[in-house]
């Protein structure tokens, strides 16, 4: 899939990476449904987008695996990948379980309306199985996601929408309501009572805000959010049209991606994406980290004499401030927080519209799962 390239081949690949990047960002409305049929775009995806997308799905599987209820500890794991594309999410699942102590039999069902995507997904799974003793099978179904509710009903332990929800009903003014209704229908039909649904979307403001709106609709429909949210209230980020919520994971990219970054002026030194993990039961990340915790939902806001973040928890989204003069060994980790961290506090001052850290405040950053 990835081989040593000459300088000219690398330049050609970089040009295709730029072309694909534009289609996935600024020119999203021009993105053809079957864009991976284009050989150049397909090679750009495999070289530049597939590796980080593996890391994203594995990060979310770790969040599920961290739960004391051992949510992924099954002898057989049935996985439904909706809009599977070339099989990236399935490869991420295979790599995750092949590296772990618990190695279930994995039964994949992959749904995509592009035959070439299903073929690539099959080749990817077959290639992985040839180098691993992990027991896995794959069933492919050619169908759009919109037609998926008509598939034979089977209870799946894991349902995945990876970078696909934003591509359906894209030009429809009622896209949020239609996406919400479709996801809710699919979860009601296909998600096991103790199963999980992972939804990954780009970190762009438009796609991330759309996902937050779908999140609110799913909560209203009775689906609890396992992660990243630490509360089930309406998402406060939607109150301001300039706000959105996304994850940002540190990442050391492989050499090829570093070379492509130099040629394209793009950056893959961290992994930005929006996501939801949805379940039917009431299990959440608070079972892992405790009830009174917050999620960091901004970059550090540094100004003269202080550092601030936005954090989100049971009371919604608020600014939290620590003045430099109040730094102590008990709260010094505050200055090293990153977007996405889960954090707890002792002796935190609640000023109503914001929180304040004093010399007496203890800051406890939870280990990233």
Short names for language-model regions:
Residues 31-67:
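Class I SAM-dependent methyltransferase Rossmann-like catalytic core
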Residues 258-369:
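C-terminal lobe and adjacent flexible extensions of AdoMet/dcAdoMet transferase-like proteins
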Residues 193-201:
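Conserved beta-strand signature within the Rossmann-like core of class I S-adenosyl-L-methionine
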Residues 86-102:
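Conserved SAM-binding loop of SAM-dependent methyltransferases across substrates and taxa
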Residues 120-150:
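S-adenosyl-L-methionine
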Residues 177-194:
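A short glycine-rich, Lys/Arg-flanked "PGG" loop and its adjoining helix->strand segment in the class I
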Residues 157-176:
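A short SAM/SAH-binding and catalytic strip from SAM-dependent methyltransferases
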Residues 1-31:
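N-terminal auxiliary segments of SAM/dcSAM-dependent transferases
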């Amino acid at each position: 899939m990835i081989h040593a390239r000459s300088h000219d081949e690398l330049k050609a690949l970089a040009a295709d990476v730029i072309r694909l990047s534009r289609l996935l960002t600024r020119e999203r409305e021009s993105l053809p449904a079957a864009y991976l049929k284009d050989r150049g775009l397909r090679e750009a995806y495999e070289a530049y987008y597939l590796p980080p997308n593996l890391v994203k799905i594995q990060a979310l599987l770790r969040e599920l695996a961290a739960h004391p209820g051992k949510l992924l500890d099954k002898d057989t794991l049935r996985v439904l990948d909706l809009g599977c594309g070339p099989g990236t999410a399935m490869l991420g699942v295979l790599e995750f379980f092949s590296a772990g102590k618990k190695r279930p039999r994995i039964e994949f069902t992959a749904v995509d309306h592009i035959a070439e995507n299903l073929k690539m997904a099959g080749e990817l799974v077959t290639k992985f199985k040839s180098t691993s003793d992990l027991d896995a099978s794959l069933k492919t179904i050619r169908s759009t996601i919109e037609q998926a509710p008509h598939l034979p009903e089977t209870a799946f332990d894991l349902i995945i929408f990876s970078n696909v929800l934003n591509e359906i009903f894209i030009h429809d003014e009622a896209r949020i309501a239609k996406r919400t209704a479709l996801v809710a229908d699919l979860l009601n039909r296909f998600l096991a009572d103790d199963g999980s649904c992972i939804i990954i979307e780009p970190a762009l403001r438009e796609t991330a805000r759309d996902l937050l709106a779908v999140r609110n609709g799913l909560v209203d429909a009775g689906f609890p959010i396992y992660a990243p949210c630490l509360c089930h209230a309406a998402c406060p980020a939607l109150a301001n049209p300039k706000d959105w919520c996304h994850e940002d994971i540190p990442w050391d990219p492989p050499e090829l991606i570093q070379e492509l970054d130099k040629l394209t002026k793009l950056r893959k030194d961290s992994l930005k994406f929006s996501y939801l993990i949805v379940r039917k039961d009431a299990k959440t990340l608070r079972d892992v980290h405790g009830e009174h915790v917050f999620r960091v939902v901004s970059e550090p806001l540094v100004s003269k004499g202080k550092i601030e973040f936005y954090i989100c928890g049971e009371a919604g989204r608020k600014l939290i401030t620590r003045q430099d003069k109040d730094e102590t060994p008990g709260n010094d980790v505050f200055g090293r927080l990153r977007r996405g961290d889960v954090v707890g506090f002792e002796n935190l001052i609640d000023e109503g519209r914001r929180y304040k850290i004093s010399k007496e405040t203890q800051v406890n950053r939870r280990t990233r799962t």
